[in-house]
Design a protein with these regions (language model features):
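Conserved kinase catalytic-core helix
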Residues: 88-95, 123-166, 205
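An alpha-helical support segment within catalytic cores of ATP-dependent transferases
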Residues: 14-32, 160-217
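Conserved short submotifs of the Hanks-type protein kinase catalytic core
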Residues: 111-124
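ATP-binding glycine-rich loop module of kinase domains
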Residues: 49-81, 137
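Short beta-strand micro-motifs within the conserved protein kinase catalytic domain, predominantly
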Residues: 98-113
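Active-site activation/catalytic loop segments of kinase-like enzymes and analogous catalytic loops
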Residues: 249-287, 304-321
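Regulatory N- and C-terminal appendages and interdomain linkers associated
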Residues: 1-39, 54-56, 313-336
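Active-site acidic catalytic loop and adjacent metal/ATP-binding pocket
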Residues: 37-61, 202-248
Length: 336
């Protein structure tokens, strides 16, 4: 079990009964005196893994409570939203091999707004990227990107609803990110004016409005995908799931790849073969691969830039590197 071991769940803790109901009702485990080991998982949210000592049954719990100042109703609403998002995607037969959306197992308003989901054993996307950036294991990352492209193309194609995309919300999100960069004193007024002008240039391009809406993962970062055997991929953490342009997901993956190589080896060019491979593999799941590839590569720079700006706003990003991210984002936005 990954994560830092922090002890056992006390028998009188309401969480103990919550976990026991889940392993009994969803896993068929009827241990008379269950005991749960607790592991704190890394990440920005309060996420813990629980392993029942005798049966080895595993559950992941995500707690929303502390994020909202202990507003139980808000926390419960967020937990319910993610629960329903997981159920929604699973109804499109994204279950099992090779495409899997993790199964939600339960929620509780009164236990810190907890959402319980199944445990999926697999390699994290971030680990696959690190094998390439740190150990030059490029073949492994190429294989994982092929699998991820297959997963996302399947999710997007199965969930397309025929309605046209609305690019305006992605422009508003761009403004939100730029505003946070300004608040963090990462950019000045000249940068804001230039970024706003570039945003308007993209808004005026018909291609940004011409695709069909799909269900998006909404936070397609390396932390939120796990790889199993062969082409198996599992998606986790769907709290930001929404309808929109498929490029919001695809471009975020591409932007994360560029960031990974910029931060690890100092060279955005090293990411280009992987980004191209990912976009090409995504395109192969459409009737006209070449036309699809041309369409998504024409839109990708906006969403890649948006992701680099999103990363640059974070406190853990050094000021010099944040400046490089902003500069790279501008170059992407200037693309034809």
């Amino acid at each position: 079990m990954n994560g830092r071991y922090v002890g056992y769940v006390a028998g009188h803790d309401p969480l103990h009964d919550f976990l026991t109901r889940i392993i009994r009702d969803h896993m068929g485990v009827r241990e008379p005196q269950p005991a749960y080991r607790v592991f704190r998982l890394s990440g920005s949210n309060e996420v813990y893994a629980y392993e029942e000592k005798f049966s080895a049954a595993k559950i992941i719990c995500k707690f929303y409570g502390s994020r909202f100042g202990w507003d139980r109703d808000k926390a419960a609403w967020m937990a319910r939203q993610e629960y329903e998002g997981l159920e929604t995607l699973r109804r499109y037969n994204l279950i099992g091999s090779p495409h899997h959306v993790i199964r939600p197992l339960g929620i509780s308003r009164d236990i810190n707004g907890v959402l319980a989901v199944e445990f999926y054993s697999g390699e994290g996307f971030s680990h696959a990227i690190a094998r390439a950036t740190r150990h030059r294991d490029d073949a492994h990352l190429y294989w994982r990107l092929k699998a991820l492209a297959y997963f996302l193309a399947t999710q997007h194609n199965r969930t397309a609803n025929g309605a046209g995309v609305d690019f305006e919300p992605d422009c508003r999100y761009f403004d939100t990110v730029v505003g946070r960069l300004e608040q963090a004193d990462r950019i000045g007024q000249w940068d804001i004016d230039e970024l706003s002008w570039l945003r308007d240039c993209w808004r005026d391009r018909p291609r940004m409005w011409q695709d069909r809406q799909v269900w998006l993962h909404g936070d397609a970062t390396p932390a939120n995908f796990l790889f199993g055997h062969g082409m198996d991929v599992a998606a986790i953490d769907l709290e930001r799931m929404k309808r929109g342009d498929r490029m919001f997901d695809v471009g975020r993956v591409a932007g994360e790849l560029q960031h990974a190589f910029m931060s690890a080896v100092g060279d955005w060019h090293r990411a280009e073969p992987f980004i191209g491979h990912f976009l090409w593999e995504y395109s192969c799941h459409f009737p006209d691969r070449q036309r699809t590839f041309e369409s998504i590569t024409a839109r990708a720079p906006y969403y890649m830039a948006l992701n680099l700006l999103r990363i640059a706003r974070n406190d853990y990003i050094g000021r010099d590197y944040g400046g490089r991210l902003v500069a790279r984002a501008k170059k992407l936005l200037r693309a034809a």
